């Protein structure tokens, strides 16, 4: 009797998992129908300092930086990117445009091949005033990165003020990030 009872319990597990997936799917459909932006990720880090880190420069192995580089009194965009990310390539031209306008962008090269990343920047242009190399993805993990690209607005004191998942484009910049950027630029 016991083996049959254990078998019945095991057969019940896939049904429960399936029902949980259906519920999660329906919740997301409802959110999308209500106009919620699926790229707007809630983050427990909003309003908190950037997690402590010590990372090498992408272009200069051995030269390290820590979170203090993001606390210089001026707002910064922290852009998580990788050469394996097709959406990163799509947003790269816009990042170059922002950099040309004087917007300070720090690149966080995420789980990537360093030499490919340097070559990529050399061929497509480098919008980053600083490129950090997160080869093992630990800072990305600490930031709660789901994938690339993601962009964080960091105020002049190193506090995360906004997070955007997906490509940074003109609509996102103008409607979501620029007003906050100006707010924290004015407070510098």
From Swiss-Prot:
Q: Which GO terms describe its molecular function?
A: disulfide oxidoreductase activity
Q: Does the keyword Membrane apply?
A: yes
- Where does this polypeptide localize? Cell inner membrane
Q: Which InterPro entries match?
A: Periplasmic_diS_OxRdtase_DsbE (IPR004799), Redoxin (IPR013740), Thioredoxin-like_sf (IPR036249), Thioredoxin_CS (IPR017937), Thioredoxin_domain (IPR013766), Thioredoxin_ResA/DsbE_sf (IPR050553)
Question: Which residues are exposed on the Periplasmic face of the membrane?
Answer: 31-188
- Pfam family name, one: Redoxin
Cytoplasmic domain ranges by topology: 1-9
Coiled-coil ranges from the UniProt annotation: none
Print the keywords alphabetically. Answer: Cell inner membrane, Cell membrane, Cytochrome c-type biogenesis, Disulfide bond, Membrane, Redox-active center, Transmembrane, Transmembrane helix
Which family is this protein grouped under? Answer: Belongs to the thioredoxin family. DsbE subfamily.
Q: What is this protein called?
A: Thiol:disulfide interchange protein DsbE
Gene of this entry: dsbE
């Amino acid at each position: 009797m016991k083996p049959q009872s254990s078998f019945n319990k095991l057969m019940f597990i896939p049904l429960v998992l399936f029902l949980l997936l259906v519920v999660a799917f329906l919740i997301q459909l409802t959110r999308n129908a209500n106009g919620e932006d699926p790229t707007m990720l809630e983050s427990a880090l909003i309003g908190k300092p950037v997690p402590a880190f010590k990372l090498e420069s992408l272009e200069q192995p051995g030269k390290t930086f820590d979170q203090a580089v993001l606390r210089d009194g001026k707002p910064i965009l922290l852009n998580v990117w990788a050469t394996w990310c097709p959406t990163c390539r799509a947003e790269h031209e816009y990042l170059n445009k922002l950099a040309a306008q004087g917007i300070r962008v720090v690149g966080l090269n995420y789980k990537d091949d360093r030499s490919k990343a340097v070559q990529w920047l050399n061929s497509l242009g480098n919008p980053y005033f600083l490129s950090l190399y997160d080869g093992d993805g630990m800072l990305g993990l600490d930031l709660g990165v789901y994938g690339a690209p993601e962009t964080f607005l960091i105020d002049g004191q190193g506090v995360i003020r906004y997070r955007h998942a997906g490509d940074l484009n003109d609509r996102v910049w103008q409607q979501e990030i620029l007003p906050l950027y100006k707010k924290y630029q004015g407070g510098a």
